Amino acid sequence: MRIFTPFRVVTFIAAVFAALSLGLGVAYAASSHHGGDGNGVEGIFNGDQHSPACVHSPRLLDRNERNVINYYYTAFNDKNPKLAVKLYGGAEYIQHNPLAANGFDAFIQFVTSFTAQFPDTKVTIKRVFADCDFVVTHSLFTGTAYGTLGQKGVDIFRLDARGKVVEHWDVLAAISPTSANGNPEV
């Protein structure tokens, strides 16, 4: 049984952010990493798997960042996921969140239902990183659904060659009421 400790999760997220912010294009983790005890991250992930012609063009990276921010804000803050998909969605939508199904129709239904149930939902993107066809956001979620302190989230989006969203992963957690270091979580 694989155990994901907070340290391992934070270390992995830090490695992803470091790779993306340095423009390396590759986040590497092998099963022999971490002492070869089988508790490391398995496999090799290369961002170029989905984009054989990865170009680190500042213009394209800016476009991708802008598209993801607009996609998220249009869907959740403007409560218009249909428009978000029309403007920023690609030909397919692969979803890795276990609460949502694949496909843009499922995304529209999920967001419409969620924002109808919690109309005060607001997403504030605090940081955004882009590398090739991936964009990572670090966000604060507020509103009734998230309690008094809110929720933090890291979302990873993959975009197609036209800068349209085609895949999504996320990690979400409640903001802690106490902190050993006094630093904000988002």
Model-based region annotation:
Residues 3-13:
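Bacterial N-terminal signal peptides that target proteins for export
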Residues 24-74, 78-87:
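Short, low-complexity N-terminal intrinsically disordered segments enriched in polar/charged residues
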Residues 34-56, 73, 109-186:
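A beta-strand edge to alpha-helix "cap/lid" segment located at domain peripheries
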Residues 63-67, 106, 149:
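Soluble or luminal CAZymes and related metallo-dependent hydrolases
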